[in-house]
A protein has these predicted regions:
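Primarily the internal scaffold of c-type cytochrome electron-transfer domains
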Residues: 2-172
Length: 172
């Protein structure tokens, strides 16, 4: 995609305010991509829960914060030639978790007891850790490897031929 205009929201990178001011997804295509969200900077911060109170801003629950399409805006990307260079959410759609109704947030932002802001009450909150391929705990067990020799007995100085199979253990 073309470079964002100087001083635009697209230059802010990932931040609390950027994500929590997304109020809608706008995409004419089958999948959201290339930052196709609508951002409304201001006093209202959006999220997945009702009843959240803050002395600094208003809050509003939006269903998109519990849907994989929210993540697709940044994790699906086409280059200027129409070629997918990132298709994370599209791959998720083709995988088992989509079919089971498990959105990205359930694994990459697991809920745990804590606070989502310093002035908030303790509650079960989405951890903003975004665990993924950079997290050894997430990667462990993602692929199951099975090896089967073609022959059960091999001479000591012989060559063994193995059939290797890889299975998706838990990758989205």
């Amino acid at each position: 995609p073309p470079r964002p205009a100087a001083g635009s929201r697209a230059n802010e990178s990932v931040s609390c305010d950027l994500c929590h001011t997304i109020s809608a997804i706008h995409s004419d295509d089958k999948f959201p991509y290339n930052f196709s969200f609508v951002s409304n900077p201001g006093r209202i911060k959006y999220g997945s829960k009702t009843g959240v109170k803050s002395p600094h801003h208003d809050t509003e629950k939006l269903d998109i914060f519990s849907q994989a399409e929210l993540c697709a805006n940044c994790h699906n990307e086409k280059n200027p030639f129409g070629v997918w260079v990132k298709s994370t959410q599209i791959e998720w759609l083709e995988g088992p978790y989509s079919k089971q109704g498990v959105p990205c947030q359930q694994c990459h932002m697991p809920k745990a007891w804590g606070r989502n802001a310093t002035m908030a009450n303790e509650d079960m909150v989405a951890q903003h850790l975004f665990n993924g391929a950079h997290d050894p705990g997430k990667v462990a067990g993602a692929i199951e490897i099975r090896m089967h020799p073609e022959e059960r007995e091999v001479n000591y100085d012989g060559t063994i031929v193995l059939k290797v199979q890889l299975f998706n253990g838990k990758a989205g």
